[in-house]
């Protein structure tokens, strides 16, 4: 693992790069071990003050895990990973109003790869499941008095699911098959009132959401409330309640009894 960070320009911007690698994988490869497992991930962040009240930041993360089992004539591999990138603008409009705007992209995938060779007979196949998502969120924090603060904003996302796409080569013949992709569009508006006095804090809010998958549209209203008291020294008690909704897209692989969920 290693981290590199520093300033881009004095008192204006900075950068950070961090990476990790599972080094026993290299040892297993040198020893020609039949079973190998490894992972890596890379994190990067750039931050720059484009104005004394406006800060722009770019964040990127990519990670992957993989496992392989190799025998005399056969090799099986599995892998899963994700990549995400976000661009965020933090703004301070006055002493009582701040805002945050973020746009993001996320890619999730898992895969299975098999290869068999024996006496001129050769089979190879790879099956993948993928999810692409891009979206945006805008949030405002506004102080109305010394005990009352409002948080409000909007969110949007678009997801595309690509279930079970298989590529194979069987004795020189190429074959491709898979299910059609599915899409989900969702949006939300939210408002939260926060009251704070002494050790007491109360939150009362509501969120309205809509989900559309090209076949049907669903609406949801999600009220939420919380009351808490802070005794100090990391001791607090709270009571909360919320009604929450979530879109779930589920694909079942026909040769497994277990489902593969994306949410």
PLM regions with names:
Residues 1-23, 32-66, 77-105, 144-150:
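Transmembrane beta-barrel wall of Gram-negative outer-membrane proteins
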Residues 2, 40-44, 60, 81-87, ...:
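Hydrophobic, lipid-facing positions within transmembrane beta-strands of outer-membrane proteins
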Residues 6-8, 48, 91, 132, ...:
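Residue-level signature of outer-membrane beta-barrel architecture
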Residues 10-23, 55, 63-66, 99-123, 165-169, 229, ...:
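Surface-exposed extracellular loop regions of Gram-negative outer-membrane beta-barrel proteins
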Residues 27-34, 68-76, 84-88, 118-127, ...:
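Extracellular loop and loop/strand-boundary signature of outer-membrane beta-barrel proteins
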Residues 71-79, 107-118, 122-131, 160-169, ...:
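Extracellular/periplasm-exposed beta-strand and loop segments of Gram-negative cell-envelope proteins
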Residues 149-236, 246-249:
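Signature of Gram-negative outer-membrane beta-barrel scaffolds
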């Amino acid at each position: 693992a290693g981290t590199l960070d520093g300033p881009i320009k004095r008192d204006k911007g900075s950068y950070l790069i961090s990476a990790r690698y599972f080094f026993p994988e290299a040892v297993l490869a040198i020893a020609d071990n039949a079973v190998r497992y490894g992972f890596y991930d890379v994190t990067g962040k750039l931050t720059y003050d484009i104005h004394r009240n406006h800060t722009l930041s770019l964040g990127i993360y990519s990670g992957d895990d993989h496992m392989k089992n190799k025998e005399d004539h056969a090799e099986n591999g599995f892998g899963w990973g994700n990549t995400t990138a976000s661009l965020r603008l933090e703004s301070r409009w006055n002493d009582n109003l701040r805002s945050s705007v973020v746009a993001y992209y996320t890619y999730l995938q898992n895969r299975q790869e098999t290869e068999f060779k024996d006496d001129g007979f050769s089979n190879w196949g790879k099956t993948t499941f993928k999810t692409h998502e891009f979206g945006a969120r805008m949030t405002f924090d506004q102080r109305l008095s010394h005990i009352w603060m409002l948080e409000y904003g909007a969110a949007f996302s678009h997801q595309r699911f690509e279930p079970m796409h298989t590529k194979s080569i069987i004795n020189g013949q190429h074959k491709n098959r898979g299910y059609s992709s599915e899409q989900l569009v969702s949006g939300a508006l939210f408002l939260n009132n926060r009251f704070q006095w002494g050790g007491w804090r109360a939150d009362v809010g509501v969120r309205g959401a809509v989900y559309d998958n090209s076949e049907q549209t669903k609406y949801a209203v999600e009220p939420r409330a919380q009351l808490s008291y802070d005794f100090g020294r990391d001791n607090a008690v709270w009571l909360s309640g919320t009604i929450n909704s979530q879109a779930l897209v589920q694909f079942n692989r026909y040769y497994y009894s277990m489902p593969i969920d994306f949410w």
